[in-house]
Amino acid sequence: MKQGTVKWFNAEKGFGFIEVEGENDVFVHFSAINQDGYKSLEEGQSVEFEVVEGDRGPQAANVVKL
């Protein structure tokens, strides 16, 4: 599992990016957030996640808010 910080997240569109120190930003889709109900992330929020290879490159999976 990696840890990072939410760089930005557009709740209307349902996606954003997670910043990982010393690495490229990682795409995150709302469906990857482990949370019941409304799935969203806040800018600057700390998260833990796995990186998987998606159709358009690396993306976050199993995202957990810290």
Swiss-Prot record:
InterPro entries: Cold_shock_CspA (IPR012156), Cold_shock_domain (IPR050181), CSD (IPR011129), CSD_CS (IPR019844), CSP_DNA-bd (IPR002059), NA-bd_OB-fold (IPR012340). Keywords: Cytoplasm. Residues 1-66 form the CSD domain. GO terms for cellular component: cytoplasm. Its main location: cytoplasm. One of its GO terms (molecular function) is nucleic acid binding. It is found in: Cytoplasm. PROSITE patterns: CSD_1, CSD_2. Involved in cold stress response. This is Cold shock protein CspA. It comes from Staphylococcus haemolyticus (strain JCSC1435). The gene is cspA.
